[in-house]
Amino acid sequence: KHFHTTCACPRFSKEKCEENAFVVDRLEEAGAILIGKTNLDQFATGLVGTRTPYGICSSVFNREYMSGGSSSGSSVSVAQGYVSFALGTDTAGSGRVPAMCNHIIGYKPTRGLLSARGVVAACRSLDCVSIFSETIRDAQLVGSIVCQFDAKDNYSRSFQIRSCPWIETSTFRFGIANEETLLFFNDQLN
């Protein structure tokens, strides 16, 4: 309700929201300060971050690279360090793709774990609020605040957040792809 929800469509720029999304209210109740809304692929229908009349969000690594989308502005704002976390949506990759392109965490929870009430729907049965952050710990913290049952969201369900022992690790591990895997994905990776 603090800002217009345009879905990157100029025609919606005069529409005032009557209420916040459920998850935004939970964050504000916990002390989060709403900075603003970010750009996206229009109506959340793109995975590149370039389908918008409001200007393209470029990758934080190179202005010539795409940021990924559709929640491009949210991912770039976290990757640039403007905010410690941001919300987006994820129906078919709109949270995970821009997170990958900008080297941050993009958490898509199981459908119904976070209320989608107040989110402009692309596909109501698949839409999820996604969380962008620089660290898994921050994503877990935001998730623990917004993961609440919402009786007004038909998909919402009660769920108890479990501890995440994989966040606390004393050893560093990494994998090396074998020759067959490298060949499958790209000859230039060899």
Residue ranges and their predicted role:
Residues 14-16, 64-68, 96, 120-122, ...:
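Short Gly/Pro-enriched turn/cap motifs at secondary-structure boundaries
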Residues 52-55, 102-106:
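Short, hinge-like loop/turn segments at secondary-structure boundaries
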Residues 1-91:
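Gly/Ser-rich catalytic/binding loops embedded in alpha/beta enzyme cores
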Residues 18, 22, 72, 89, ...:
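Conserved active-site and cofactor/substrate-binding residues in soluble primary-metabolism enzymes
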Residues 3-5, 45-49, 96-101, 118-119, ...:
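Short acidic, glycine/serine/threonine-rich loops at helix termini
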Residues 105-189:
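A short helix-breaking turn/cap at a secondary-structure junction
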Residues 30-31, 50, 101, 111, ...:
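Alpha-helix boundary/capping residues
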Residues 40-42, 89-95, 99-101, 180:
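Acidic, glycine-rich active-site loops and adjacent beta-strand->loop/helix elements
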